[in-house]
């Protein structure tokens, strides 16, 4: 008899068929208490859980006593109560490798869009303001040969450094939990403390996961240390930044501009002051959102769940210790 799983994210037919070759699949649209109650028997018997963006906490796990593995279609897992999963010996699988290049592309796009004011001037053209040869009030700033500061030199940081170094001749500073000899050898990157990076970088790119240690890591103190001409980029997790402090720094001119793909609250409220600032490029968390990469992420998550329920946690497992 096939193990039962809950699927809470719509998948392409070919991936759904692959799941159904291995499991009895119950599809739901979300993990709300109402949905769990409506499908109580399926949740009670499920050994696997696959999807993205929904909160998985102890209250849900209480309803899933047979759960052995959950697989998220994402690299981040801050919506999972990892302690609760560990306590119940439930494996957590994620997709850390397949989105690297695409997210690095998004970061580079934010760097270019903010420095060259791409969104702002495009909107001015559409509004009919381009009526003569443009003057300095339309000008942006160069990207090439400017100093890039990367906070978090993981896979995505490395991919961004590659683009910046070889494509734009940018000197690279980085701050991370440990030094990265490969980054220093390949990209001539210089490891430094966070204060030095903030003071010297023309672009500060934040690529960190959300943890207890990183929550509000960037606040008023950090923005005050940046150059007034510096541009802040965040494509990691929104709550790593104190958004009120960011808004204040932009309003006071402590920093020049910001390119943001993540926010403390998502979707970003329509009355956020960030949306009224022409020097802010705000994206709807599109870091990995291409057709190709999202398919590959879903395929990876499917493979991860199959592997986990077969006892294989050699890769992409957040908590392999619970399998021992």
Swiss-Prot record:
* Listed SUPFAM superfamilies: Formate/glycerate dehydrogenase catalytic domain-like (SSF52283), NAD(P)-binding Rossmann-fold domains (SSF51735)
Against PROSITE patterns, the record matches this protein to: D_2_HYDROXYACID_DH_2, D_2_HYDROXYACID_DH_3
Pfam families per UniProt: 2-Hacid_dh, 2-Hacid_dh_C
What keyword terms does UniProt attach to this protein? Cytoplasm, NAD, NADP, Oxidoreductase
Primary localization: cytoplasm
Subunit structure as annotated in this protein's UniProt entry:
Homodimer.
Q: Known HAMAP family for this protein?
A: 2_Hacid_dh_C_GhrB
The protein here is known as Glyoxylate/hydroxypyruvate reductase B
**Species for this entry:** Escherichia fergusonii (strain ATCC 35469 / DSM 13698 / CCUG 18766 / IAM 14443 / JCM 21226 / LMG 7866 / NBRC 102419 / NCTC 12128 / CDC 0568-73)
Record gene name: ghrB
């Amino acid at each position: 008899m096939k193990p039962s799983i809950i699927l809470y994210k719509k998948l392409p037919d070919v991936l759904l068929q692959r799941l159904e070759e291995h499991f009895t699949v119950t599809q739901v649209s979300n993990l709300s208490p109402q949905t769990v109650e409506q499908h109580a028997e399926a949740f009670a018997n499920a050994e696997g859980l696959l999807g993205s963006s929904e909160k998985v906490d102890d209250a849900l796990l209480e309803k899933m006593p047979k759960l052995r593995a959950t697989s998220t279609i994402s690299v981040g897992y801050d919506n999972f109560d990892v302690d609760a999963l560990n306590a119940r010996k439930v494996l957590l699988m994620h997709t850390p490798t397949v989105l690297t290049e695409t997210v690095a592309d998004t970061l580079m796009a934010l760097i270019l869009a903010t420095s060259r004011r791409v969104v702002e001037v495009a909107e001015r053209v559409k509004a009919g303001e381009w009526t003569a040869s443009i003057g300095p009030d339309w000008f942006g700033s160069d990207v090439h040969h400017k100093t890039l500061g990367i906070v978090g030199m993981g896979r995505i940081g490395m991919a961004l450094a590659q683009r910046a170094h070889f494509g734009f001749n940018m000197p690279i500073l980085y701050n991370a939990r440990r030094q990265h000899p490969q980054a220093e050898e390949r990209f001539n990157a210089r490891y430094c403390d966070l204060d030095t990076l903030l003071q010297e970088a023309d672009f500060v790119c934040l690529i960190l996961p959300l943890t207890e240690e990183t929550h509000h890591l960037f606040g008023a103190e950090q923005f005050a240390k940046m150059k007034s001409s510096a541009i802040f980029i965040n494509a990691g997790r929104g709550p790593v930044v104190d958004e009120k402090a960011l808004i204040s720094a932009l309003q006071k001119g402590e920093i020049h501009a910001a390119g943001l793909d993540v926010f403390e609250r998502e979707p970003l409220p329509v009355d956020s002051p960030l949306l009224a600032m022409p020097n802010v490029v705000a994206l709807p968390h599109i870091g990995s959102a291409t057709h190709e990469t999202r398919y590959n992420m879903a395929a990876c998550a499917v493979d991860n769940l199959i592997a986990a329920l077969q006892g294989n946690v050699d890769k992409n497992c957040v908590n392999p210790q619970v399998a021992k």
